[in-house]
Amino acid sequence: MGLPFQIEYGQTTGRPELIEDALRQFSAALALTADAGGLYVHGYDESRNQRWANPASGKSPAIWARAVGWLAMALVDALVILPDDSATAELRERTRRLLAGIIARQTQAGLWMQVLDNQGLAGNYAETSASAMFAYALLRAARLGLLRGEEAKAALSAGRQALAALLETRLELDEQGVARLTGIVHVAGLGGFDGNYRDGTPDYYLTEPVVSDDAKGVGPLMMAYAESLLLAR
């Protein structure tokens, strides 16, 4: 999440080594967490000591939508401010494939599931914050030319559908008439926390509390809506 800021800092201060470092970090993270289905798992343990880590690959066992949402936003935010050259070519291709994979997993209702790659999992649900993150990443990638042609059209369609679904189904008025953004998973992680061990299985991600008005959902929704306004200019 911090790498787009590192890149901008490197650009502003004339320190290209910071940009090169950020690109290496992106590439390493993608290589270590890539899933056979074209998405990215939540975590990686080089030591393989954590119980959630696959003993062969070190990867966690499930694809959590919000983790992919953070990744998609970071990749898009970084690439739209970098030159389209050989230094970023591989990362751009990986990002295009990721965005295509996200579009392919959008539900008919326009949102995305908490466990992203398993819509049929019992108890799985459409999660607000990841859906807002994906809407932002798709709309921004299309608006600023990271995606072109049919890819851009598909991203615009998916992003607009997601934003409309969020505004129509996830904003609810409370008893005082205040609009609340609902359906946001509060937090999820891996390993020990607060006396519990988070094992990273698909079922684990369905046990975390779902809340309203968490900044991790409100912020991306505002960002996605801003992209829609910029596209309408």
UniProtKB/Swiss-Prot annotation:
Induction conditions: By certain acidic polysaccharides found in carrot root extract. This induction may be regulated by the polygalacturonase.
Keywords for this entry? Hydrolase
Pfam families with a match to the protein in the record:
Glyco_hydro_88 (PF07470)
Tell me the GO BP annotations in alphabetical order.
Answer: carbohydrate metabolic process
Task: Spell out the InterPro entries in the cross-references.
Answer: 6-hairpin_glycosidase_sf, 6hp_glycosidase-like_sf, Glyco_hydro_88, PolySaccharide_Degr_Enz
Task: Say if the entry is tagged with keyword Hydrolase.
Answer: yes
Name any one GO molecular function: hydrolase activity
Q: Does the keyword Ion transport apply?
A: no
Q: What does this protein do?
A: Seems to regulate the surface properties of the bacterium in the presence of plant cells or plant cell extracts. Mutations in this protein are responsible for an increased aggregation of the bacteria in the presence of pea root cap cells.
* Family statement: Belongs to the glycosyl hydrolase 88 family.
Name this polypeptide is given: Protein Atu3128
Write down the species: Agrobacterium fabrum (strain C58 / ATCC 33970) (Agrobacterium tumefaciens (strain C58))
